[in-house]
Swiss-Prot record:
Single GO BP term: lignin catabolic process
Organism of origin: Trametes hirsuta
Domain of life where this protein originates: Eukaryota
Name listed for the protein in its UniProt record: Laccase
Disulfide bond entries: C106-C509, C138-C226
Top EC group: oxidoreductase
Protein backbone atom coordinates (compact mmCIF):
# COMPACT_ATOMS: atom_id res chain seq x y z
CA UNK A 1 0.00 0.00 0.00
CA UNK A 2 1.43 3.37 -1.00
CA UNK A 3 1.71 6.19 1.51
CA UNK A 4 -1.07 7.99 -0.36
CA UNK A 5 -3.35 4.96 -0.16
CA UNK A 6 -2.68 4.51 3.54
CA UNK A 7 -3.34 8.22 4.11
CA UNK A 8 -6.55 7.94 2.12
CA UNK A 9 -7.57 4.91 4.17
CA UNK A 10 -6.86 6.87 7.34
CA UNK A 11 -8.92 9.83 6.16
CA UNK A 12 -11.84 7.60 5.16
CA UNK A 13 -11.66 5.77 8.51
CA UNK A 14 -11.55 9.11 10.32
CA UNK A 15 -14.62 10.34 8.46
CA UNK A 16 -16.42 7.12 9.32
CA UNK A 17 -15.40 7.54 12.95
CA UNK A 18 -16.66 11.12 13.07
CA UNK A 19 -20.20 9.92 12.54
CA UNK A 20 -19.96 7.91 15.75
CA UNK A 21 -18.68 10.69 18.02
CA UNK A 22 -21.72 12.03 19.85
CA UNK A 23 -22.21 15.76 20.35
CA UNK A 24 -24.43 17.63 22.81
CA UNK A 25 -26.19 18.76 24.86
CA UNK A 26 -24.44 21.97 23.76
CA UNK A 27 -23.10 21.81 20.22
CA UNK A 28 -22.66 23.48 16.87
CA UNK A 29 -24.30 21.82 13.88
CA UNK A 30 -22.77 23.18 10.69
CA UNK A 31 -24.97 22.53 7.67
CA UNK A 32 -23.14 22.50 4.35
CA UNK A 33 -22.95 20.81 0.96
CA UNK A 34 -20.42 18.10 0.17
CA UNK A 35 -19.90 15.21 -2.20
CA UNK A 36 -20.66 11.88 -0.55
CA UNK A 37 -20.78 8.28 -1.80
CA UNK A 38 -22.40 6.22 0.96
CA UNK A 39 -23.35 3.46 -1.49
CA UNK A 40 -20.42 3.85 -3.88
CA UNK A 41 -22.18 6.41 -6.08
CA UNK A 42 -20.92 9.99 -5.72
CA UNK A 43 -23.37 12.88 -5.46
CA UNK A 44 -23.72 16.26 -3.79
CA UNK A 45 -25.61 16.17 -0.50
CA UNK A 46 -26.57 18.19 2.56
CA UNK A 47 -24.28 17.23 5.44
CA UNK A 48 -24.12 18.00 9.16
CA UNK A 49 -20.61 18.57 10.54
CA UNK A 50 -19.38 17.05 7.24
CA UNK A 51 -21.27 13.76 7.49
CA UNK A 52 -24.59 12.21 6.55
CA UNK A 53 -26.37 10.92 8.49
CA UNK A 54 -25.43 13.70 10.89
CA UNK A 55 -23.64 13.02 14.17
CA UNK A 56 -25.48 11.51 17.11
CA UNK A 57 -26.78 14.26 19.38
CA UNK A 58 -26.92 12.98 22.96
CA UNK A 59 -27.62 14.10 26.49
CA UNK A 60 -29.41 13.06 29.65
CA UNK A 61 -32.95 13.40 30.89
CA UNK A 62 -33.26 16.83 32.45
CA UNK A 63 -30.67 18.45 30.19
CA UNK A 64 -31.00 21.79 28.49
CA UNK A 65 -30.07 21.41 24.83
CA UNK A 66 -28.42 24.36 23.12
CA UNK A 67 -27.93 23.40 19.49
CA UNK A 68 -26.52 26.14 17.32
CA UNK A 69 -27.33 25.56 13.65
CA UNK A 70 -24.87 27.27 11.31
CA UNK A 71 -26.08 27.49 7.70
CA UNK A 72 -23.18 27.27 5.25
CA UNK A 73 -25.28 25.88 2.38
CA UNK A 74 -24.37 26.94 -1.16
CA UNK A 75 -26.34 24.60 -3.45
CA UNK A 76 -29.73 26.03 -4.38
CA UNK A 77 -30.97 22.76 -5.90
CA UNK A 78 -31.07 21.37 -2.33
CA UNK A 79 -32.05 24.77 -0.88
CA UNK A 80 -29.65 27.22 0.73
CA UNK A 81 -31.90 27.86 3.70
CA UNK A 82 -32.69 25.30 6.37
CA UNK A 83 -34.79 24.63 9.45
CA UNK A 84 -34.34 21.72 11.85
CA UNK A 85 -36.94 19.69 13.72
CA UNK A 86 -35.97 17.78 16.86
CA UNK A 87 -38.29 14.86 16.33
CA UNK A 88 -40.25 13.57 19.32
CA UNK A 89 -39.56 16.40 21.75
CA UNK A 90 -42.60 18.11 23.24
CA UNK A 91 -40.98 21.58 23.22
CA UNK A 92 -43.28 22.71 26.01
CA UNK A 93 -42.76 26.45 26.31
CA UNK A 94 -40.45 26.50 23.27
CA UNK A 95 -42.82 25.97 20.35
CA UNK A 96 -40.55 28.40 18.44
CA UNK A 97 -37.76 25.76 18.58
CA UNK A 98 -39.81 22.91 17.07
CA UNK A 99 -38.44 23.55 13.59
CA UNK A 100 -41.08 23.15 10.84
CA UNK A 101 -40.56 25.95 8.35
CA UNK A 102 -43.53 28.34 8.03
CA UNK A 103 -45.35 26.67 10.92
CA UNK A 104 -42.99 27.44 13.82
CA UNK A 105 -40.32 29.66 12.21
CA UNK A 106 -38.94 31.19 9.05
CA UNK A 107 -35.99 29.23 7.66
CA UNK A 108 -32.41 30.04 8.62
CA UNK A 109 -30.74 31.83 5.73
CA UNK A 110 -27.37 30.82 4.32
CA UNK A 111 -24.57 32.69 6.05
CA UNK A 112 -26.57 32.90 9.27
CA UNK A 113 -27.00 30.79 12.39
CA UNK A 114 -29.78 30.11 14.87
CA UNK A 115 -29.70 28.68 18.38
CA UNK A 116 -32.29 26.04 19.22
CA UNK A 117 -32.47 26.23 23.02
CA UNK A 118 -34.87 23.85 24.74
CA UNK A 119 -35.32 21.86 27.93
CA UNK A 120 -35.97 18.12 28.13
CA UNK A 121 -37.27 17.81 31.70
CA UNK A 122 -39.22 14.59 31.51
CA UNK A 123 -38.44 12.75 28.28
CA UNK A 124 -35.82 10.11 27.57
CA UNK A 125 -35.26 7.58 24.83
CA UNK A 126 -34.60 7.57 21.11
CA UNK A 127 -35.33 10.59 18.94
CA UNK A 128 -33.86 12.09 15.76
CA UNK A 129 -33.41 15.39 13.99
CA UNK A 130 -33.96 16.42 10.40
CA UNK A 131 -34.53 19.34 8.10
CA UNK A 132 -38.16 20.43 8.14
CA UNK A 133 -37.93 22.58 5.02
CA UNK A 134 -39.37 21.08 1.84
CA UNK A 135 -37.69 17.73 0.98
CA UNK A 136 -34.24 18.73 2.23
CA UNK A 137 -33.83 15.88 4.70
CA UNK A 138 -34.00 13.38 1.82
CA UNK A 139 -30.73 14.91 0.60
CA UNK A 140 -28.92 14.11 3.83
CA UNK A 141 -29.85 16.50 6.65
CA UNK A 142 -30.93 13.89 9.20
CA UNK A 143 -29.38 12.18 12.19
CA UNK A 144 -30.08 10.32 15.46
CA UNK A 145 -30.70 11.92 18.86
CA UNK A 146 -30.62 10.00 22.17
CA UNK A 147 -31.58 11.17 25.64
CA UNK A 148 -30.26 8.75 28.25
CA UNK A 149 -32.13 8.10 31.49
CA UNK A 150 -29.75 7.58 34.45
CA UNK A 151 -32.66 5.75 36.11
CA UNK A 152 -33.78 3.72 33.10
CA UNK A 153 -36.37 1.20 34.34
CA UNK A 154 -35.12 -1.31 31.73
CA UNK A 155 -31.45 -1.01 32.78
CA UNK A 156 -31.29 -4.57 34.14
CA UNK A 157 -32.14 -6.00 30.71
CA UNK A 158 -28.94 -4.97 28.88
CA UNK A 159 -25.20 -4.54 29.36
CA UNK A 160 -24.31 -2.14 26.54
CA UNK A 161 -26.03 1.07 25.40
CA UNK A 162 -23.72 3.60 23.74
CA UNK A 163 -22.93 5.50 20.54
CA UNK A 164 -22.21 2.21 18.76
CA UNK A 165 -25.62 0.66 19.49
CA UNK A 166 -27.57 3.24 17.49
CA UNK A 167 -28.76 1.83 14.15
CA UNK A 168 -30.06 4.27 11.54
CA UNK A 169 -32.03 3.30 8.44
CA UNK A 170 -32.22 5.71 5.51
CA UNK A 171 -33.46 5.66 1.95
CA UNK A 172 -30.88 7.08 -0.44
CA UNK A 173 -31.38 8.52 -3.91
CA UNK A 174 -28.81 9.16 -6.61
CA UNK A 175 -30.74 12.26 -7.69
CA UNK A 176 -31.39 15.27 -5.45
CA UNK A 177 -35.01 15.38 -4.31
CA UNK A 178 -35.90 18.57 -6.19
CA UNK A 179 -34.31 17.30 -9.41
CA UNK A 180 -36.08 13.94 -9.38
CA UNK A 181 -39.71 12.90 -9.71
CA UNK A 182 -42.25 14.33 -7.25
CA UNK A 183 -42.99 10.79 -6.09
CA UNK A 184 -39.96 8.52 -6.57
CA UNK A 185 -40.64 4.88 -7.41
CA UNK A 186 -38.18 3.67 -4.77
CA UNK A 187 -34.79 4.52 -3.36
CA UNK A 188 -31.54 3.60 -5.07
CA UNK A 189 -30.16 2.20 -1.83
CA UNK A 190 -30.97 1.56 1.80
CA UNK A 191 -28.29 2.93 4.10
CA UNK A 192 -27.76 1.26 7.46
CA UNK A 193 -25.59 3.45 9.69
CA UNK A 194 -24.80 5.51 6.61
CA UNK A 195 -23.56 2.72 4.36
CA UNK A 196 -25.21 0.48 1.80
CA UNK A 197 -25.30 -0.80 -1.74
CA UNK A 198 -27.43 -0.14 -4.77
CA UNK A 199 -27.97 -2.79 -7.46
CA UNK A 200 -25.30 -0.99 -9.52
CA UNK A 201 -22.76 -0.66 -6.68
CA UNK A 202 -22.60 -4.11 -5.08
CA UNK A 203 -18.93 -3.73 -4.11
CA UNK A 204 -19.61 -0.83 -1.74
CA UNK A 205 -18.79 -1.23 1.94
CA UNK A 206 -21.49 -2.34 4.34
CA UNK A 207 -21.90 -1.21 7.93
CA UNK A 208 -20.52 -3.62 10.52
CA UNK A 209 -21.98 -3.77 14.02
CA UNK A 210 -19.69 -5.54 16.46
CA UNK A 211 -20.84 -7.58 19.45
CA UNK A 212 -19.16 -9.75 22.06
CA UNK A 213 -20.62 -13.19 22.70
CA UNK A 214 -22.46 -13.33 26.00
CA UNK A 215 -23.34 -9.65 26.20
CA UNK A 216 -26.77 -8.04 25.92
CA UNK A 217 -27.06 -4.94 23.74
CA UNK A 218 -29.65 -2.19 23.70
CA UNK A 219 -29.89 -1.29 20.03
CA UNK A 220 -31.72 1.92 19.16
CA UNK A 221 -33.28 1.53 15.70
CA UNK A 222 -34.12 4.85 14.04
CA UNK A 223 -35.92 5.28 10.74
CA UNK A 224 -34.55 8.36 9.00
CA UNK A 225 -36.62 7.41 5.96
CA UNK A 226 -38.13 9.91 3.54
CA UNK A 227 -40.52 7.38 2.10
CA UNK A 228 -40.39 3.57 2.41
CA UNK A 229 -41.01 1.59 5.53
CA UNK A 230 -38.52 -1.19 6.22
CA UNK A 231 -38.85 -4.71 7.57
CA UNK A 232 -35.90 -5.10 9.91
CA UNK A 233 -34.43 -8.37 11.17
CA UNK A 234 -31.13 -9.93 12.21
CA UNK A 235 -30.52 -13.51 11.11
CA UNK A 236 -30.50 -15.99 13.98
CA UNK A 237 -31.51 -13.48 16.67
CA UNK A 238 -34.67 -12.44 18.44
CA UNK A 239 -35.25 -8.77 19.26
CA UNK A 240 -36.85 -7.75 22.57
CA UNK A 241 -38.57 -4.38 22.11
CA UNK A 242 -38.38 -2.13 25.20
CA UNK A 243 -39.04 1.36 23.81
CA UNK A 244 -41.35 2.79 21.15
CA UNK A 245 -40.81 6.38 19.94
CA UNK A 246 -39.23 7.31 23.31
CA UNK A 247 -41.98 5.62 25.35
CA UNK A 248 -40.82 2.74 27.57
CA UNK A 249 -42.77 -0.39 26.68
CA UNK A 250 -43.36 -3.78 28.22
CA UNK A 251 -40.68 -6.12 26.83
CA UNK A 252 -41.95 -7.84 23.67
CA UNK A 253 -39.98 -10.53 21.86
CA UNK A 254 -40.19 -10.34 18.06
CA UNK A 255 -38.10 -11.58 15.15
CA UNK A 256 -38.90 -8.79 12.70
CA UNK A 257 -39.94 -5.15 12.97
CA UNK A 258 -41.80 -3.21 10.29
CA UNK A 259 -40.60 0.32 11.00
CA UNK A 260 -42.23 3.28 9.28
CA UNK A 261 -40.61 6.59 8.38
CA UNK A 262 -39.60 8.52 11.52
CA UNK A 263 -40.40 5.73 13.99
CA UNK A 264 -37.93 4.45 16.59
CA UNK A 265 -37.59 1.23 18.56
CA UNK A 266 -35.12 0.12 21.20
CA UNK A 267 -34.61 -3.62 21.30
CA UNK A 268 -32.37 -5.85 23.37
CA UNK A 269 -30.26 -8.34 21.43
CA UNK A 270 -28.65 -11.16 23.37
CA UNK A 271 -25.40 -12.07 21.60
CA UNK A 272 -25.85 -15.75 22.41
CA UNK A 273 -25.26 -17.35 19.01
CA UNK A 274 -22.12 -18.99 17.63
CA UNK A 275 -19.26 -16.58 16.96
CA UNK A 276 -19.66 -15.57 13.32
CA UNK A 277 -21.21 -13.06 10.93
CA UNK A 278 -24.97 -12.57 10.61
CA UNK A 279 -26.93 -10.54 8.09
CA UNK A 280 -28.80 -7.49 9.32
CA UNK A 281 -31.70 -6.88 6.94
CA UNK A 282 -33.84 -3.80 6.25
CA UNK A 283 -36.10 -4.55 3.31
CA UNK A 284 -38.03 -1.57 1.92
CA UNK A 285 -41.71 -2.01 1.07
CA UNK A 286 -41.08 -0.96 -2.54
CA UNK A 287 -38.26 -0.10 -4.92
CA UNK A 288 -35.08 -2.18 -4.85
CA UNK A 289 -36.34 -4.96 -2.60
CA UNK A 290 -34.59 -8.15 -1.54
CA UNK A 291 -30.96 -8.76 -0.65
CA UNK A 292 -29.20 -9.72 -3.90
CA UNK A 293 -25.60 -8.55 -3.86
CA UNK A 294 -25.91 -7.34 -0.28
CA UNK A 295 -28.42 -4.55 -0.87
CA UNK A 296 -30.63 -3.54 2.09
CA UNK A 297 -28.11 -5.15 4.41
CA UNK A 298 -25.47 -4.70 7.10
CA UNK A 299 -23.37 -7.15 9.11
CA UNK A 300 -23.60 -8.23 12.75
CA UNK A 301 -20.10 -9.45 13.59
CA UNK A 302 -19.14 -11.28 16.77
CA UNK A 303 -15.70 -10.57 18.21
CA UNK A 304 -13.40 -13.30 16.94
CA UNK A 305 -15.26 -13.85 13.68
CA UNK A 306 -13.45 -13.54 10.36
CA UNK A 307 -13.97 -10.18 8.60
CA UNK A 308 -16.07 -11.72 5.84
CA UNK A 309 -19.62 -11.36 4.61
CA UNK A 310 -22.21 -13.54 6.31
CA UNK A 311 -23.53 -16.72 4.74
CA UNK A 312 -26.57 -16.85 7.01
CA UNK A 313 -30.01 -17.26 5.49
CA UNK A 314 -33.22 -15.51 6.36
CA UNK A 315 -35.98 -17.56 7.94
CA UNK A 316 -39.64 -16.64 7.67
CA UNK A 317 -40.56 -14.51 10.69
CA UNK A 318 -42.69 -16.37 13.22
CA UNK A 319 -42.98 -13.45 15.66
CA UNK A 320 -43.33 -10.28 13.57
CA UNK A 321 -44.10 -7.09 15.45
CA UNK A 322 -47.81 -6.34 15.70
CA UNK A 323 -48.49 -2.86 17.08
CA UNK A 324 -51.44 -4.06 19.18
CA UNK A 325 -49.00 -6.20 21.20
CA UNK A 326 -47.10 -3.10 22.37
CA UNK A 327 -48.04 -1.68 25.77
CA UNK A 328 -46.50 1.07 27.91
CA UNK A 329 -44.27 -0.09 30.75
CA UNK A 330 -45.84 2.35 33.20
CA UNK A 331 -49.58 2.94 33.27
CA UNK A 332 -50.56 5.75 30.91
CA UNK A 333 -54.15 6.94 31.10
CA UNK A 334 -55.91 7.13 27.75
CA UNK A 335 -57.59 10.53 27.30
CA UNK A 336 -61.38 10.55 27.23
CA UNK A 337 -63.86 7.84 28.12
CA UNK A 338 -63.59 4.25 26.88
CA UNK A 339 -66.11 4.51 24.05
CA UNK A 340 -65.79 5.56 20.41
CA UNK A 341 -65.96 9.34 20.25
CA UNK A 342 -65.76 9.62 24.04
CA UNK A 343 -63.73 12.83 23.90
CA UNK A 344 -64.23 16.59 23.94
CA UNK A 345 -63.28 16.97 20.28
CA UNK A 346 -63.27 14.24 17.63
CA UNK A 347 -61.88 14.99 14.18
CA UNK A 348 -62.00 12.72 11.16
CA UNK A 349 -59.22 13.16 8.61
CA UNK A 350 -60.59 12.48 5.12
CA UNK A 351 -57.71 11.94 2.69
CA UNK A 352 -57.69 12.71 -1.01
CA UNK A 353 -55.29 13.18 -3.92
CA UNK A 354 -55.72 14.91 -7.29
CA UNK A 355 -52.66 13.60 -9.12
CA UNK A 356 -50.29 16.27 -7.81
CA UNK A 357 -51.47 17.23 -4.32
CA UNK A 358 -52.77 15.49 -1.22
CA UNK A 359 -55.77 16.85 0.68
CA UNK A 360 -57.11 16.50 4.21
CA UNK A 361 -60.78 17.40 4.59
CA UNK A 362 -60.65 19.20 1.26
CA UNK A 363 -57.56 21.33 1.90
CA UNK A 364 -54.00 20.83 0.67
CA UNK A 365 -51.38 22.39 2.95
CA UNK A 366 -49.51 25.24 1.25
CA UNK A 367 -46.83 26.82 3.47
CA UNK A 368 -47.91 30.34 4.47
CA UNK A 369 -45.47 33.21 4.01
CA UNK A 370 -45.84 34.11 7.70
CA UNK A 371 -45.26 31.20 10.12
CA UNK A 372 -48.40 30.14 11.98
CA UNK A 373 -46.73 30.84 15.34
CA UNK A 374 -45.95 34.40 14.23
CA UNK A 375 -49.53 34.86 13.01
CA UNK A 376 -50.80 33.89 16.47
CA UNK A 377 -48.27 36.04 18.33
CA UNK A 378 -49.26 38.92 16.04
CA UNK A 379 -52.86 38.68 17.17
CA UNK A 380 -54.75 36.13 15.04
CA UNK A 381 -57.03 34.34 17.51
CA UNK A 382 -59.31 32.15 15.39
CA UNK A 383 -58.64 29.25 13.05
CA UNK A 384 -60.50 31.04 10.27
CA UNK A 385 -58.05 33.94 10.58
CA UNK A 386 -55.01 31.67 10.35
CA UNK A 387 -53.30 30.69 7.13
CA UNK A 388 -53.16 28.45 5.20
CA UNK A 389 -56.92 28.59 4.89
CA UNK A 390 -58.64 25.30 5.68
CA UNK A 391 -55.48 23.66 7.05
CA UNK A 392 -55.45 25.11 10.59
CA UNK A 393 -57.64 23.57 13.30
CA UNK A 394 -58.20 25.37 16.59
CA UNK A 395 -58.09 23.06 19.63
CA UNK A 396 -59.19 24.18 23.11
CA UNK A 397 -56.89 23.83 26.12
CA UNK A 398 -57.04 20.84 28.48
CA UNK A 399 -59.32 18.90 26.17
CA UNK A 400 -59.32 15.25 25.16
CA UNK A 401 -58.89 14.94 21.39
CA UNK A 402 -59.55 11.97 19.12
CA UNK A 403 -58.28 11.84 15.54
CA UNK A 404 -59.29 9.13 13.08
CA UNK A 405 -57.52 8.41 9.81
CA UNK A 406 -59.68 6.17 7.61
CA UNK A 407 -57.51 4.55 4.95
CA UNK A 408 -58.75 5.18 1.44
CA UNK A 409 -57.78 4.30 -2.10
CA UNK A 410 -58.29 8.01 -2.82
CA UNK A 411 -54.88 8.66 -1.18
CA UNK A 412 -52.35 6.41 -2.95
CA UNK A 413 -49.02 5.47 -1.44
CA UNK A 414 -50.42 3.86 1.71
CA UNK A 415 -49.56 3.05 4.41
CA UNK A 416 -49.08 6.70 5.33
CA UNK A 417 -47.17 7.21 8.61
CA UNK A 418 -48.62 10.22 10.45
CA UNK A 419 -46.64 12.27 12.96
CA UNK A 420 -48.01 14.71 15.51
CA UNK A 421 -45.65 17.37 16.85
CA UNK A 422 -45.68 18.44 20.49
CA UNK A 423 -47.27 15.26 21.85
CA UNK A 424 -47.22 11.52 22.21
CA UNK A 425 -50.63 9.97 21.51
CA UNK A 426 -52.45 6.81 22.47
CA UNK A 427 -53.01 4.50 19.50
CA UNK A 428 -56.48 3.28 20.43
CA UNK A 429 -56.96 1.55 17.08
CA UNK A 430 -53.96 0.26 15.13
CA UNK A 431 -53.53 -0.59 11.47
CA UNK A 432 -54.56 -4.18 10.79
CA UNK A 433 -56.95 -4.22 13.74
CA UNK A 434 -60.62 -3.42 14.27
CA UNK A 435 -60.29 -3.44 18.07
CA UNK A 436 -60.39 -0.23 20.11
CA UNK A 437 -58.09 -0.43 23.13
CA UNK A 438 -58.81 2.22 25.76
CA UNK A 439 -57.05 0.27 28.50
CA UNK A 440 -53.33 -0.06 27.71
CA UNK A 441 -52.53 0.94 24.11
CA UNK A 442 -49.05 2.04 23.17
CA UNK A 443 -48.33 5.76 23.08
CA UNK A 444 -46.07 6.99 20.29
CA UNK A 445 -45.56 9.98 17.95
CA UNK A 446 -45.65 8.34 14.49
CA UNK A 447 -48.31 5.83 13.51
CA UNK A 448 -49.00 3.87 10.36
CA UNK A 449 -52.48 4.69 9.11
CA UNK A 450 -52.70 1.35 7.35
CA UNK A 451 -54.30 0.40 4.05
CA UNK A 452 -57.74 0.58 2.45
CA UNK A 453 -57.53 -3.15 1.66
CA UNK A 454 -57.49 -3.86 5.40
CA UNK A 455 -60.38 -1.49 6.04
CA UNK A 456 -58.18 0.43 8.46
CA UNK A 457 -59.41 3.35 10.53
CA UNK A 458 -56.43 4.13 12.74
CA UNK A 459 -57.50 6.23 15.71
CA UNK A 460 -55.39 8.19 18.18
CA UNK A 461 -56.03 10.27 21.30
CA UNK A 462 -54.11 13.00 23.08
CA UNK A 463 -54.72 15.81 25.57
CA UNK A 464 -54.16 19.48 24.76
CA UNK A 465 -51.67 20.37 27.50
CA UNK A 466 -49.10 22.18 25.32
CA UNK A 467 -50.09 25.57 23.84
CA UNK A 468 -48.83 26.26 20.34
CA UNK A 469 -49.30 25.45 16.67
CA UNK A 470 -48.32 21.81 16.12
CA UNK A 471 -47.91 20.14 12.75
CA UNK A 472 -49.71 16.87 11.97
CA UNK A 473 -48.48 15.35 8.72
CA UNK A 474 -47.61 12.34 6.67
CA UNK A 475 -43.93 11.59 7.29
CA UNK A 476 -43.38 10.44 3.74
CA UNK A 477 -41.57 13.67 2.91
CA UNK A 478 -42.65 13.67 -0.73
CA UNK A 479 -46.29 13.51 0.45
CA UNK A 480 -45.79 16.34 2.95
CA UNK A 481 -44.28 18.41 0.14
CA UNK A 482 -47.52 17.75 -1.79
CA UNK A 483 -49.65 19.18 1.01
CA UNK A 484 -50.43 16.15 3.19
CA UNK A 485 -50.64 18.06 6.48
CA UNK A 486 -52.67 20.18 8.86
CA UNK A 487 -51.76 22.41 11.80
CA UNK A 488 -53.38 22.11 15.21
CA UNK A 489 -53.45 25.56 16.82
CA UNK A 490 -53.64 24.44 20.42
CA UNK A 491 -54.92 26.80 23.12
CA UNK A 492 -54.52 29.91 20.96
CA UNK A 493 -55.13 32.46 23.77
CA UNK A 494 -52.17 31.14 25.77
CA UNK A 495 -49.69 30.56 22.93
CA UNK A 496 -47.83 33.87 23.19
CA UNK A 497 -47.47 33.86 26.98
CA UNK A 498 -46.52 30.17 27.10
CA UNK A 499 -43.87 30.47 24.38
CA UNK A 500 -41.78 33.64 24.78
CA UNK A 501 -39.69 33.98 21.64
CA UNK A 502 -36.05 35.11 21.50
CA UNK A 503 -35.04 38.11 19.40
CA UNK A 504 -33.03 35.85 17.09
CA UNK A 505 -36.26 34.03 16.22
CA UNK A 506 -37.99 37.31 15.39
CA UNK A 507 -35.07 38.22 13.14
CA UNK A 508 -35.39 35.07 11.00
CA UNK A 509 -38.33 36.24 8.87
CA UNK A 510 -37.03 39.65 7.78
CA UNK A 511 -33.68 38.10 6.85
CA UNK A 512 -35.33 35.26 4.90
CA UNK A 513 -37.96 37.48 3.27
CA UNK A 514 -35.22 39.74 1.86
CA UNK A 515 -33.56 36.86 -0.01
CA UNK A 516 -33.65 36.44 -3.75
CA UNK A 517 -35.57 33.27 -4.63
CA UNK A 518 -32.31 31.62 -5.75
CA UNK A 519 -30.85 32.17 -2.30
CA UNK A 520 -33.72 30.57 -0.46
Amino acid sequence: MSRFQSLLAFVVASLAAVAHAAIGPTADLTISNAEVSPDGFARQAVVVNNVTPGPLVAGNKGDRFQLNVIDNLTNHTMLKSTSIHWHGFFQKGTNWADGPAFVNQCPISSGHSFLYDFQVPDQAGTFWYHSHLSTQYCDGLRGPFVVYDPNDPHASLYDVDNDDTVITLADWYHTAAKLGPAFPLGADATLINGLGRSPSTTAADLAVINVTKGKRYRFRLVSLSCDPNHTFSIDGHDLTIIEVDSINSQPLVVDSIQIFAAQRYSFVLNADQDVGNYWIRANPNFGNVGFAGGINSAILRYDGADPVEPTTTQTTPTKPLNEVDLHPLATMAVPGSPVAGGVDTAINMAFNFNGTNFFINGASFVPPTVPVLLQIISGAQNAQDLLPSGSVYSLPSNADIEISFPATAAAPGAPHPFHLHGHAFAVVRSAGSTVYNYDNPIFRDVVSTGTPAAGDNVTIRFRTDNPGPWFLHCHIDFHLEAGFAVVFAEDIPDVASANPVPQAWSDLCPIYDALDVNDQ
